[in-house]
Amino acid sequence: MFCTSPATRGDSSESKPGASVDVNGKMEYGSAPGPLNGRDTSRGPGAFCTPGWEIHPARLVEDINRVFLCIAQSSGRVTRDSRRLRRICLDFYLMGRTRQRPTLACWEELLQLQPTQTQCLRATLMEVSHRPPRGEDGFIEAPNVPLHRSALECDVSDDGGEDDSDDDGSTPSDVIEFRDSDAESSDGEDFIVEEESEESTDSCEPDGVPGDCYRDGDGCNTPSPKRPQRAIERYAGAETAEYTAAKALTALGEGGVDWKRRRHEAPRRHDIPPPHGV
């Protein structure tokens, strides 16, 4: 998985008094965090959880569906990025199923938080670690949440033998390395905006909801990624407007110099003789 277990790495931590469940708490949440205040739980990137956290299937479904919606509206590669989200959900399930937990440093990398932004997370992890273990495994039923599924992808049965694998160069989970965000920007693939397919004539009206769609590389009807194209057009328009304004200001400045020079060379009012007969 993402991180090796303490036993594999040879690390050891003393258990905290009364921490009969979590014997490696310092590896997971560090030192005991101080009491949380209103600012910690309401502002900043780390204000997404509080101690006493429980699994709410309805909230989980709505949150994941919201991310699917963001992908459908803004991604240039809807199918590929939807698979990324599904892999994330599966990997976190497997971490719990195989009893592997991220270290605090691993949490910071996964959630992209600074050490000063992990107060709520650390307090929540510490509280959960001191809960008594559940007696037996349980199952979560699908909640009855009335929402429109945003992952609008079709099942193509006759794909002509096309490769259905990802083309993003994904690496196996056991060799994943955390990289700087600046290094990620060098990969131009994430900034590809796919054009609408001219061959796709199917209507895209899932569940009676009309909307534009295009057929992606996997042959699936997905919402047309128009937002990135609009963003590019707005950026180009802003760049053109900025260039035009700069050019106008430059011309105005040059014209102002000529105007001052002409005004200086022009005859004064008292030097101009009055008209004849005045």
UniProtKB/Swiss-Prot annotation:
UniProtKB keywords: Early protein, Eukaryotic host gene expression shutoff by virus, Eukaryotic host transcription shutoff by virus, Host cytoplasm, Host gene expression shutoff by virus, Host nucleus, Host-virus interaction, Inhibition of eukaryotic host transcription initiation by virus, Inhibition of host RNA polymerase II by virus, Transcription, Transcription regulation, Virion, Virion tegument
Subcellular location: Host cytoplasm; Host nucleus; Virion tegument
Biased composition, class Acidic residues, residue ranges: 155-169, 183-205
Record's keyword annotation contains Acetylation: no
Region listing for Disordered, in residue ranges: 1-42, 154-229
Any Gene Ontology CC annotation: host cell nucleus
Region IE62-binding: start-end pairs: 1-142
Native source organism of the sequence: Varicella-zoster virus (strain Dumas)
Pfam families per the UniProt record, alphabetical: Herpes_IE68
Origin superkingdom: Viruses
Post-translational modification comment from the UniProt entry: Phosphorylated in vitro by host and by protein kinase ORF47.
Quaternary structure and partners: Interacts with IE62; this interaction modulates the function of IE62. Interacts with several components of host pre-initiation complex including GTF2E1, GTF2H2 and POLR2A; these interactions lead to repression of gene transcription. Interacts with host ASF1A; altering its ability to bind histones.
Known role: Immediate early (EI) protein that functions as a transcriptional regulator of cellular and viral mRNAs mainly by interacting with several general transcription factors thereby disorganizing the preinitiation complex at certain promoters. May additionally help to regulate levels of histones in virus-infected cells by interacting with host ASF1. By inhibiting host transcriptional program, IE63 plays a major role in the ability of VZV to overcome the innate immune response to the virus.
Protein name: Transcriptional regulator ICP22 homolog
